[in-house]
């Protein structure tokens, strides 16, 4: 029988709900605002209990919007889809900073690196995102320019936004790609 040595669990930034702080880190209070967030938190807690009885390493990765070719369940993918269908783009908080994305290939590298680590911990949570947050309005403008979008862009009032503190992961592993680098990869992957 082989023993399980490592578990890498894919969770979500949705576990924070609508944070009251502008910057979210691993110590930010979680919130079960959606069924999805509630299920992910229950799974995280089950894994925390699991390690009490077993000798293995558990790493929780709380993911932002994962972008790449054919991604569709996140904010940036919805904008790209609206552009391709020549629909009006609507978004809020153009002056807020945004790094709530990670390119799918970069995520694969992260998982591989964690699977090969020799670090001494039993349970660890990491928020992922891109480094060097950029203003959301700038990000939307870059996407619109890349796809030569000339239709209407509507800015609406929305709840306060946040950006992700990724310092813990970068301290323990490696520097993550910048927001602009991830956005560039996303644009190129969706131009085909």
Model-identified regions with their sequence ranges:
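Short glycine-/acidic-enriched loop or helix-start segments at secondary-structure transitions
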Residues: 18-20, 70-72, 137-139
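Hydrophobic positions on the long internal alpha-helix
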Residues: 1, 46-47, 110, 114
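NAD(P)-dependent short-chain dehydrogenase/reductase
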Residues: 45-99, 104, 108, 143
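Active-site helix of classical SDR
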Residues: 35, 39-42
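Active-site pre-Tyr helix/loop in NAD(P)-dependent dehydrogenases
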Residues: 12-13, 29, 35, 63-69, ...
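Conserved Rossmann-fold NAD(P)-dependent oxidoreductase catalytic core, especially the SDR/UDP-sugar
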Residues: 1-35
